Amino acid sequence: MKFMLGLACTAALCFVAPAFGQAAAVTTGKPAADQQLDGHYDLQNPFAKIIRGELPADKVYEDAEVVAFLSTNQKAPGHVLVISKTSQARNILDMSPADLTRVMLVAKRVASAERIALGADGLIVQQNNGAAAGQTVFHLHVHVIPCWNGKPPSFARVKSGQLDRKALAARIAAAMH
């Protein structure tokens, strides 16, 4: 059995560590085909819908190729996702070097903006590939999560009532310039 970020896994069984007061989820076998490293791009995934303007997002940056917005699952106030608008890459294995470079350059700018706007003492830059690695939306995305001294990073979701998402996005966006 191995343990990774809240998962206890054997070859065919994973237990997802629950948040306080919740029951553990158990999955067996392999994830669905489109949740593995190889699969088909789903045009109805939430990030594709954000790109098309079908879902709202608290954007901190956008250009013709990349958009960065607050994650709906805030691991810390200011947790931003950076995605390509031009690529239908599900994971890093599908992404062209040019598109990956553009996404990472914007992730770096977001990290700098979080440091300035939020006074972050540290930053987590994370990118997951496949359900086995914790990927839940199969459109390549990079997490940029601010951290502060004295407050160890938490992978528990920040309660939405604790955040003014629009104000937070505006602060980060202002520091992007």
Whereabouts are the PLM-identified features?
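Hydrophobic helical h-region of N-terminal Sec-dependent signal peptides
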Residues: 9-13
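HIT superfamily nucleotide-processing domains
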Residues: 2-6, 19-177
